[in-house]
Amino acid sequence: MIPKLLKHELTFPHPNDATEDGIVAWGGDLNPSRLIRAYQNGIFPWYGKNDPIIWWSPNPRLIMELDDFKLSRSLRKSMKKFEYRFDTNFINVMKNCQNIKRVKQDGTWIQDEIIEAYSVLHDMGIAHSVESYLDGELVGGLYGVAVGGLFCGESMFTLVNDASKSAYAVLINHLKIWGYDFIDAQVPTEHLKNLGAKEVSRDYFLDRLHKVNMNIINHKWELLHVNT
């Protein structure tokens, strides 16, 4: 039986007790303390409309080593046409991720309550957005959660070819500079594998998670990065 979380308790079952599909628990709420505790333990929420909150720790897990990102010549060229900003348009990035149509996906897992909850994390300097602009218009980007030296990528969107991949490349460059260890890409996808991400076991991921640099201070990333 999948454990149910109570709203007054912030503890989670151990990820290794997850179901074969990677479900750790269900229920609870999305208050900041619970979300932070979840990410610190390699767990994240992911659920559909009208479903209860479901907490996951998949096995295998997809991660991106910062030095493994594959920056093709064509992407390097595309990157030069965009302007990049950090943490200046967080809610609109989330809303675009919510509304973008995706292949083989009916509807979105990004509910309005998810946007509200992660906006609170953003105000706390824990959730971040990377944004690509073309002629002053937001055309792509991504958002995620920082846990010490780990960045947990949540979702990305693109309205113009290569806009989200370019934002991802800019993110990786800055994570290296800031002393981050790696990116948690969560659920394996061919798109991110093609960019250099790899599947690892849950045990390996949790071991890496517990060794990340926890001296990185949470703060807003309000930077302006003009072209590349």
Curated annotation (Swiss-Prot):
Its EC number is 2.3.2.6. Transmembrane segments: none annotated. GO terms for molecular function: leucyl-tRNA--protein transferase activity. Gene3D superfamilies: Leucyl/phenylalanyl-tRNA-protein transferase, C-terminal domain, Leucyl/phenylalanyl-tRNA-protein transferase, N-terminal domain. One of its GO terms (cellular component) is cytoplasm. It is an enzyme of class 2 (transferase). It is found in: Cytoplasm. PANTHER family: LEUCYL/PHENYLALANYL-TRNA--PROTEIN TRANSFERASE (PTHR30098), LEUCYL_PHENYLALANYL-TRNA--PROTEIN TRANSFERASE (PTHR30098:SF2). Functions in the N-end rule pathway of protein degradation where it conjugates Leu, Phe and, less efficiently, Met from aminoacyl-tRNAs to the N-termini of proteins containing an N-terminal arginine or lysine. This is Leucyl/phenylalanyl-tRNA--protein transferase. It comes from Sulfurimonas denitrificans (strain ATCC 33889 / DSM 1251) (Thiomicrospira denitrificans (strain ATCC 33889 / DSM 1251)).
